């Protein structure tokens, strides 16, 4: 089996997100990934592992993850790893990652796995001329591409160019429910923004014999936003991280002290 995840968006120092809480959540996530990968032959990470050019603290998190990897792991870049057109800072992590753990292969150019029979189109190559057409459409493709979420989110390339592939496993859109056409998104394993309700996040388990797949959920802390009218209802939460919005008239709101919540 192949474990497929994407859109980790490792980032510390996000507004309203305590670094200690975020670090603990990443480590819980890493533990779940390592546990799940034990029953798999390979792990593919489909781009946007980082949210930006990483800080030293964010690199330390990444290195702590790959140091414990025990199964072949292929990592390719997404749009958040792009530095300029057709370039990615992942190129600077290839050798360092392999030196830390030879099982980790960072891919920054188009790649074909001859053994299992699939292609990898990193984001750095996505917008090159005929980049999609260079692949064998009889084989599955792994890539990082924005699909469509009507009415506001438009595809970044003509999705018809992927139509002849048996299946396309992709990073970018953060919800598995955005799976469309023959493009399957695992979604982001961790909420990267605050939601009103808990959302399902997860990963794909892919059978390389017939390229069938199943989606499974992660169990991780989430970022939640709640609206209250009484400041007494602003209750700190230990597992999830919750921030509060207070509704009321101007005089009432003026009397509320500033708080981390």
Tell me the role of every PLM-derived stretch.
Residues 151-215:
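Conserved beta-sheet core of the metallophosphoesterase superfamily
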Residues 1-61, 65, 131-138:
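N-terminal active-site segment of His-dependent metallophosphoesterases
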Residues 38, 42, 207-261:
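Accessory, non-catalytic peripheral segments of nucleic-acid enzymes
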Residues 4-6, 43-48, 73-84, 102-109, ...:
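Active-site neighborhood of phospho(di)ester-bond hydrolases with catalytic His/Asp-centered motifs
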Residues 81-161, 189, 210:
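Conserved catalytic scaffold of divalent metal-dependent phosphoesterases
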């Amino acid at each position: 089996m192949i474990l497929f995840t994407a859109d980790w968006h490792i980032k510390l120092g996000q507004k309203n997100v305590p670094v200690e809480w975020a670090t603990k959540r990443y480590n819980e996530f890493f533990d779940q990934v390592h546990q799940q990968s034990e029953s798999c032959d390979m792990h593919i990470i489909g781009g946007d592992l980082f949210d930006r050019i990483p800080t030293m603290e964010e690199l330390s998190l990444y290195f702590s993850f790959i140091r414990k990897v025990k199964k072949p792991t292929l990592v390719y870049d997404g749009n958040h790893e792009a530095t300029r057109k057709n370039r990615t800072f992942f190129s600077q992590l290839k050798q360092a990652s392999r030196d830390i753990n030879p099982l980790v292969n960072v891919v920054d150019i188009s790649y074909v796995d001859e053994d299992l029979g699939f292609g990898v189109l990193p984001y750095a190559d996505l917008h090159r001329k005929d980049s999609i057409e260079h692949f064998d459409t009889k084989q599955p493709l792994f890539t990082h591409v924005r699909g469509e979420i009507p009415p506001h989110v438009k595809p970044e390339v003509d999705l018809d160019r992927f139509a002849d592939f048996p299946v396309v496993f992709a990073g970018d859109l953060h919800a598995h429910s955005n799976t469309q056409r023959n493009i399957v998104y695992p979604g982001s394993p961790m909420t990267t923004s605050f939601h009103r309700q808990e959302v399902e996040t997860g990963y794909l388990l892919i059978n390389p014999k017939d390229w069938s797949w199943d989606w499974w959920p992660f169990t991780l802390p989430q970022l939640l936003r709640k609206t209250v009218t009484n400041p007494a209802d602003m209750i700190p939460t230990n597992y999830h991280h919750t921030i509060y919005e207070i509704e009321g008239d101007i005089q009432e709101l003026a009397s509320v002290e500033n708080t981390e919540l």
